[in-house]
Design a protein with these regions (language model features):
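Transmembrane alpha-helix termini and helix-breaking/packing motifs in multi-pass membrane transporters
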Residues: 32, 85-87, 144-165, 169, ...
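Cytoplasmic helix-loop-helix junction between adjacent transmembrane helices
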Residues: 98-141
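Juxtamembrane intracellular "pre-TM" segments in multi-pass secondary transporters
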Residues: 1-5, 181-218
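C-terminal transmembrane bundle of multi-pass solute transporters/carriers
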Residues: 43, 68, 234-362
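Helix-loop boundary and gating motifs at the non-cytosolic
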Residues: 2-53, 212-255
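C-terminal ends and interior cores of transmembrane alpha-helices
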Residues: 76-90, 285-298
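Conserved MFS/SLC helix-loop-helix module at the cytosolic interface between two early adjacent transmembrane helices
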Residues: 52-89
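Helix-loop junctions on the cytosolic side of multi-pass membrane transporters
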Residues: 159, 163-193
């Protein structure tokens, strides 16, 4: 039990170091640097195209080479992204930075979840995974909210110093990740060549997806809601100042919207009797309300809409992750979790440029 607690605590600490930064309101920072919303939409599209290309390979690498190693690679990619952004001058260098950041997400998405679930499963505690996911989503939202709260501070410091602090965070994160214990399912093919392991992982994952159509449907529903919430919150960073919110209140408003996700992640733990369709429909309705609130004359209504959207998104995310992890076989857990992230990226590649145009002219 103490070893499991140490393992889970290290994953929580890594999540804090990987998600808290002075540059959380990166859309606002780019806007302040003179980038247009359409350009920001292009940068976001590059991010998701990179995710699209490397999401599945990164998941397979985690299942073949080890989850701990890929989490360390993830931190290194984030470090490179911050370094490039520090010296960026135009859209091209910003896009390169976004690509490194996308790779960071690729190597961590699914990998940490797989390591956590198999760690809990090895101790017979897999029933606690939904609580782990709730805590993790709370960390993500709180770190994201606190990061955006630092928006004014980051703008005052300058983007170079702001991104420079991320280099320190990633170095600390790597030190924490080195303390993790690798937990991999027993494999009968440990002596097989690497290419054989890759092909076997792909073949078995495809076989699972072919027979588990329900899992694919769940992935799509969750990714669609998550993508809509993501683009809404991203562009509200730029729309709120245009609607008249005082600069000193922007960080607090962005934090409040992120706290909606915290409420959703905690609330879903008390709704165990709700079936998945009920959770999905409620989450979709809350995100739709957020989009409608974006047109409100008063910016507090826009903030409330963002809060409700985040609430629905994270409640659905926690329930989805717990449901899917219980369905996935351990040997392909990271790969199959990456399929969900891949689905999200496909939707975001389409939505990001459309949202940039939509929020500019609508």
């Amino acid at each position: 039990m103490p070893k499991i607690q140490k393992q889970i605590s290290a994953l929580y600490t890594s999540a804090v170091l990987g998600n808290f930064s002075l540059t959380g309101a990166w859309v606002a920072i780019l806007t302040a640097r003179g980038f247009r919303l359409v350009e920001i939409g292009i940068a976001e599209t590059v991010f998701h195209i990179t995710s699209l290309l490397f999401e599945l390979p990164s998941g397979i690498m985690a299942d073949v080479f080890g989850r701990k190693r890929m989490l360390i690679v993830s931190a290194l990619m984030q470090l490179m992204g911050n370094l490039v952004m520090m010296f960026s001058r135009g859209l091209v260098s910003v896009c390169i930075s976004m690509s490194f950041t996308a790779l960071s997400y690729n190597f961590s998405s699914g990998t940490g979840d797989a390591l956590a679930y198999d760690s809990l499963k090895s101790a017979g505690l897999e029933g606690r995974y939904e609580k782990f996911q709730s805590n993790l989503m709370t960390i993500y939202r709180l770190c994201g909210g606190l990061s955006t709260l630092c928006a004014g501070f980051a703008l005052a410091l300058g983007y170079k110093i702001a991104y420079g602090t991320g280099l320190v965070s990633q170095a600390m994160q790597i030190c924490v990740l080195l303390t993790l214990r690798e937990v991999m399912p027993d494999r009968p093919r440990q002596t097989e060549p690497i290419l054989s392991k890759f092909s076997a992982c792909i073949r078995e994952s495809l076989s699972f997806l072919h027979t588990a159509r329900k899992a694919l449907c769940i992935m799509f529903c969750n990714s669609l809601v998550g993508a809509l919430d993501t683009v809404l919150l991203f562009f509200l960073q730029a729309k709120l100042p245009a609607r008249g919110i005082p600069q000193q209140e922007l960080g607090a408003a962005l934090l409040l919207m992120e706290l909606g996700g915290v409420v959703g992640a905690r609330l879903i733990l008390h709704l165990s009797r709700w079936d998945y369709p009920s959770v999905f429909l409620t989450a979709a309705a809350l995100v739709a309300a957020g989009f409608l609130a974006e047109h409100a004359v008063a910016y507090p209504v826009m903030v409330l809409g963002g809060f409700l959207s985040a609430l629905g998104d994270d409640a659905l995310q926690v329930r989805t992750n717990a449901l899917l992890q219980g369905m996935f076989p351990s040997q392909q857990r990271a790969t199959l979790t990456s399929v969900e992230s891949f689905t999200f990226s496909v939707i975001m590649v389409v939505l990001s440029p459309l949202a940039g145009i939509l929020f500019t002219y609508w």
